[in-house]
Amino acid sequence: SQPKSMEAAAKYIAGNFSDMGYAVTMQPVSGGNVKKGAAIYNILVYKPGLYSNNQSIVVGANYDSSGRRNNGSGTALLLETARGLKDIPTNHNIYFVAYANGAEPAGKSISSGACVHAGTLSGSIGATNILGMINLEPQKLDAGGERKQPGPEASREAVLFTTTPHGKKFAGQCAAPFAKSWEQAPTTFYREPSALTGNDRHYAVLGIPTVSCRSKYPVTDARTEEYVQALTDMIHQIADNDAPEPAKNAGQGEKAS
C-alpha cells in the first residue's frame, strides 16, 4: 500500500466511475497503511433513490492490498455492479464506496476507510437510515493451477455470506435474489460484530445490518461474470425493497439497539 500506487488506484477508480456518468466524491482518509503526510481517499458515488428520504444501502470494497488474500479485487466487483445499476431506478439511495486502508493492519482500526465512511454517513443521515451494508470481498487472482470444472458440492460452497445476528433478516433479504440469479443459495455464517475482520465490521458495530459476500472462484474463472450479475441483481432488489413503516409493523419494525 505505497502512496503512489494508492493514488494511482484511486485515480483509476474515480475515472471509471466518472466514465459511467456518476459524480465522484473523494473522502480523505489518514494514517494506517500510508506514510505520514500522504493523501489517500475513499472514492464515493451516490445514486439517489426514487423516494425522497435518507433510507440508503451501502455497497463497498477496499482497493488497497495486503497480499494474495486481500488483494483489492473486490473493487472490480464494486465497479461492475455500479455499472450494471447506473440507469436502473431504485426506491432507496445507494452509496458505492471504494475504501482506502481496508487491508490489514489498518483495516480493523479507526484509520480504516470503512470506519471513516461509516461514522460520517451515520452521523449525517442517522444509522437507522442505513438499511444495510454489503461488503464485496476480494477474489483469488488466479486459479493456481489447472482449472477444474466444479462439481455440485463445489458449487454449493462457492459463495459465502457472513452476517451478524442483528443482520440475519438483511442477509436473508440479500440471499433470496442472489440465489435466484446464481441458481444456488449462498452458505451463510454468523459472527458477532467484534469478530468481523472486513469493511463490514465498522458498520456492524454501529448496529447497521451487514452482509459480506465472498466468491471462492478466482477472478479469471468463467463463473465470475455470473457472480457479478447475481450481485447486481441482489443489490437492485435490496435497494428497491419497500421498507415497512414501524407503526404498521409493531414489534417487527422496531429499531434494534
Question: What are the residue ranges of the model-derived segments?
Answer:
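A non-catalytic alpha/beta surface segment that caps or lines the substrate-entry region
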Residues: S1-P48
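Surface-exposed patches in mature extracellular/periplasmic domains of secreted proteins
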Residues: Q2-M6, Y22-S30, P89-I94, A185-S194, ...
